[in-house]
Amino acid sequence: FASAAISGGDETTPISFSLSRCNFVEGANTIAVEMHQSDATSSDLSFNLQLLGNIGGGTPVISRGPYLQSGSQTSITIRWRTNVACNGRVEVGTVLGAYTIAGPDESCPTTEHSVTITGLVPDTKYYYQVSATDGTVLQGDADNYFRTNPPENTTRKIRVVAFGDCGRGNSAYQDDNLANYRNYLATNGIDAPDAWILLGDNAYNSGTDVEYTNNFFGIYGNNILKNHKLYPAPGNHDYGNSSANKASRSMPYHSIFTVPQNGEAGGVPSNYQNFYSYDVGNIHFLSLDSYGTEADLTSMLPAGSSTLKTW
């Protein structure tokens, strides 16, 4: 489970994790927690742990997302969070309300949902519906759609939007930029770009889960997150805004996002979340982590055997 690095005023905010019942075994269970100071001279470490059980009940409601991950020509991963644990289901179709393709139902009740749909047609617009497996529809309307990536031989224009420092925690600034961007889409008759790239610093100030909720999902969750295929990269704020965390790979960023690190969207598999590549039409993208440190950076980068693209 992803951990977090916090400092200053963030230290007074509890960090919560949801554990599915499938994480437990019958009998005794051990929960291990490891804590570190940011440096050898820091002396104000304290720790409290509270374990709460939810025996079930309650109607699930989406509290984060849905958002689109690891988009390729023939597949996509849809993620979301619910207020109570349930088994998730995703259905898609080329006509709104007529969902003819379904991903695998989640086998374990959870609040952190992720379903991958495969077998899709390239460069095709699909509508999707997110539900619980008991039939409770959580979301599925005209704004819940995506377009699969076009093939390499496409001749149409490829549209890409890049957001940097988009989770800065200034709602007035973010709302204004978002309004201008959405106005551009509407004025030019564009549903959504083919890729939405995050350049880092996605949740100020320390990249905590609460800050992601407020400063990223709270801003974009009710609009473009539903229909923009997202390809993220981390920045210093996603590492807790601390150089002491440069080697950490257990920040909330790493559990929030799913990236095509296994070559499922084109390119050479990196098998590593912080460095990955993907194709959108005849364009090949590389996503690089410029803040974190690696013991062996060369092993994280593609070996050069990928087919060359026009761009």
Please give the residue ranges for each predicted region.
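Metal-dependent phosphoester/phosphodiester hydrolase catalytic core
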Residues: 58-311
